[in-house]
């Protein structure tokens, strides 16, 4: 449902050139390629293993309109202009938003739009960013509009944190049910005790996210969508 909502709010249409910044394991890039077969979808990730996974999934699904570029976003330069640029949970890991938005503005076609999905906090003290997103941040709702130039926010939406709280609870339950297999997968690359420690850390992370995003009916920590 969130993938479809992302496409709707981004104003994606078949035949567009779509660039996803920080595509992760390809959920949105693959979904967009499947649902908009006349579009060209380019994902950017700093992980070669993510690129291999996405391209493998594309082959299995018979999708020939997906490309993945492995690059650090601080050094990335887009291959041409795009009708839509989409970023889902990447801006939290970037520091100089003004410079990033300036660069993105140069990657958009004349009628192009940027869609940003980002975690945010009601307050601007970044408490959660300091304690749970080391190296990243938890911006306040008005940060992006303040630094958007040369772009400007056309429309914005708030998704209550309760949705992400339920997602975190589901991830936690899934990890509990598959803890043995997950630990085995990590054992080898990691010593056995470190593998178990990593599983416990993920359990704590999911529980923390569920509690924090569910706090105060999801009004304190939440998700924001912006179209620029």
Region spans (language model):
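Conserved class I S-adenosyl-L-methionine
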Residues: 15-24
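Conserved alpha-helix/loop element of class I SAM-dependent methyltransferases that forms part
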Residues: 1-16
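Conserved SAM-binding strand-loop segment of SAM-dependent methyltransferases
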Residues: 61-73
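A short acidic, Gly/Pro-enriched loop at the edge of an enzyme's catalytic core
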Residues: 74-85
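Substrate-binding/catalytic lobe of Class I Rossmann-like enzymes that use SAM or dcSAM, i.e.
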Residues: 120-223
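A short glycine-rich, Lys/Arg-flanked "PGG" loop and its adjoining helix->strand segment in the class I
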Residues: 98-113
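Conserved SAM-binding loop
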Residues: 54-55
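Conserved SAM-binding loop of SAM-dependent methyltransferases across substrates and taxa
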Residues: 27-37
